[in-house]
Amino acid sequence: RTSWGQGYRFPSMAELFVSTNASGIEIYANPELKPETGWSAELGIKQAVQINKWVGFIDVAAFIMKYYDMMEFTFGQWGDPLTMPLYGLGFKSVNIGETQISGIELSVNGQGKINNDLIINLIGGYTYMNPIVMNPDEVYTESIGQILINGELIGPELTYSNSSSDPSILKYRYQHIAKIDAEFIINEDYILGTSVRYNDFMRNIDKVFTDEWLNQELIPGINEAREKFSNGDLIFDIRAGYNLNEDAKLSLIVNNIFNREYMSRPADMRPQRTIALQLSLKI
């Protein structure tokens, strides 16, 4: 299969005109924000397979997405340092220029009927992405003043190189994402399942989050956590269920069973181990 399409995103009213505070961080409006445009293309193949008692599908696709005037929230001094909170420091949505996201995606879906009493369902997926800024040294905006980050003055001219912890990749993106889910159906009534989720290390964040003073005085532990989890995140979930009858199912679900600490972005802890008892009814 193949596909090609174009996209257009107009800035939201909040990005254009609303200045606010979120969890102690100032968010500034940008009435000069330009729309984001782009195109995407995909080339893939989906193949049915059968091996002994297993049947399923394998899907492989390559993709590329190109963006122009991409919008991204960037840290800087956007407000008057004499009158605004935190000396005018905060985030604002700005156009960072031309970007590209390319990669491959593999997905597998299969079922094996081992015997009359056991059926196994498998679902797996893996995505590799290479999200980059085409011109990391290009000045895309100017802040009001300079910021001292780890002893280096940044600004007022902002580039992707001087505002990022790793400018070789877009901020807050993963390059490797994988998930595997296995479900065992026993005697049609008992269900056991497990899933594993993996993402690699988030290499690029706003450079300000790596500042030693910020890590010591305002948001302790960001650098320590990034170093601790530099190999990425591996999360395990399990579930068990029993079909009470044709219309009712009782399930026990445990997410993040090993209670791993992980973050989707700096200072944003994701849920710890959760245990849920679920009753599903068909009415």
What are these regions (language model features)?
Residues 1, 5, 44-48, 100, ...:
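Transmembrane beta-barrel domains of outer membrane proteins
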Residues 26-31, 90-96, 163-168, 222-226, ...:
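Extracellular loop and loop/strand-boundary signature of outer-membrane beta-barrel proteins
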Residues 8-9, 66, 198-222, 230-283:
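C-terminal beta-signal and adjacent terminal beta-strands/loops
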Residues 4-10, 17-19, 47-49, 62-69, ...:
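Transmembrane beta-strands of outer-membrane beta-barrel pores
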Residues 17-27, 77-90, 146-163, 214-221, ...:
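Flexible, solvent-exposed coil segments and beta strand-coil junctions
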Residues 53, 57-66, 88-208:
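Gram-negative outer-membrane beta-barrel transporters
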Residues 7-67, 78, 83-113, 170-176, ...:
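Outer-membrane beta-barrel signature, preferentially recognizing the C-terminal barrel domain
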Residues 14-19, 26, 70-77, 129, ...:
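Outer-membrane beta-barrel translocator domains and adjoining extracellular loop/strand segments
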